[in-house]
From Swiss-Prot:
One of its GO terms (molecular function) is structural constituent of ribosome. The lineage of its organism: Bacteria, Pseudomonadati, Pseudomonadota, Betaproteobacteria, Burkholderiales. This is Small ribosomal subunit protein bS16. GO terms for biological process: translation. One of its GO terms (cellular component) is small ribosomal subunit.
């Protein structure tokens, strides 16, 4: 099953997450099908903290991909931020 979830990057104490479409059997930071966006929890005021390619997210959901709970929360947060 294809899932859309976070893959951790960055360095120690400086997390950075890629939002990826991957097979659920792959490791968290392992092989992925496509990078859909990113999330930087430590972004400062001048930096972009969240970017999601909505067209690709819609495509993957259309072919049956499931969102992880955290990615679902981030998508909701991004939609709220875009509307404001």
């Amino acid at each position: 099953m294809v899932v859309i979830r976070l893959a951790r990057g960055g360095s120690k104490n400086r997390p950075f997450f890629n939002i990826v479409a991957t097979d659920s059997r792959n490791r968290r930071d392992g092989r992925f099908i496509e990078r859909v966006g990113f999330y930087n929890p430590l972004a400062t005021e001048g930096e972009e903290g969240l970017r999601i390619a909505q067209d690709r997210l819609s495509y993957w959901q259309g072919v049956g991909a499931q969102l992880s709970p955290t990615v679902a929360r981030l998508v909701k947060q991004g939609a709220k931020k875009a509307a404001a």
